[in-house]
Amino acid sequence: MARVKRGVTTRARHKKVIKLAKGYRGRSKNCYRVALQRVEKALQYAYRDRRNRKRFFRSLWIMRINAAVRQYGLLYSDFIYGLSLANITLNRKILADMAVHNKDNFKQIVDLTKEALTKSRVG
């Protein structure tokens, strides 16, 4: 059986890691063993933060909606409940965008939710 020399695959694997470590400081950019540790940790951070980004943006949208709704005398929780009563199915991302960029349309939605809330409390 022929002898298998592993230099080609090792070099390719090392090049791949060094390429991922481009832009790092010190030995992290050109020393394979250090670069491998740094790249693995960077990938862990990336995996974690892809999930954290979703949480962060949802909380940001909620803060923006809450701030915009309080200008019209409503609480965030009442506003969300009023949306469900009024059968308005806009998500928080769209509502937050409207609160920042389309204040007139957002005011109309707030008025609709106020009407739905008063109807539910009266009848």
From Swiss-Prot:
InterPro entries: Ribosomal_bL20 (IPR005813), RIBOSOMAL_L20_CS (IPR049946), Ribosomal_protein_bL20_C (IPR035566). It comes from the Bacteria. It holds the Pfam family Ribosomal_L20. PROSITE patterns: RIBOSOMAL_L20. Keywords: Ribonucleoprotein, Ribosomal protein, RNA-binding, rRNA-binding. GO terms for biological process: ribosomal large subunit assembly; translation. GO terms for cellular component: ribonucleoprotein complex; ribosome. GO terms for molecular function: rRNA binding; structural constituent of ribosome. Binds directly to 23S ribosomal RNA and is necessary for the in vitro assembly process of the 50S ribosomal subunit. It is not involved in the protein synthesizing functions of that subunit. Belongs to the bacterial ribosomal protein bL20 family. HAMAP family: Ribosomal_bL20 (MF_00382). This is Large ribosomal subunit protein bL20. It comes from Ehrlichia ruminantium (strain Gardel).
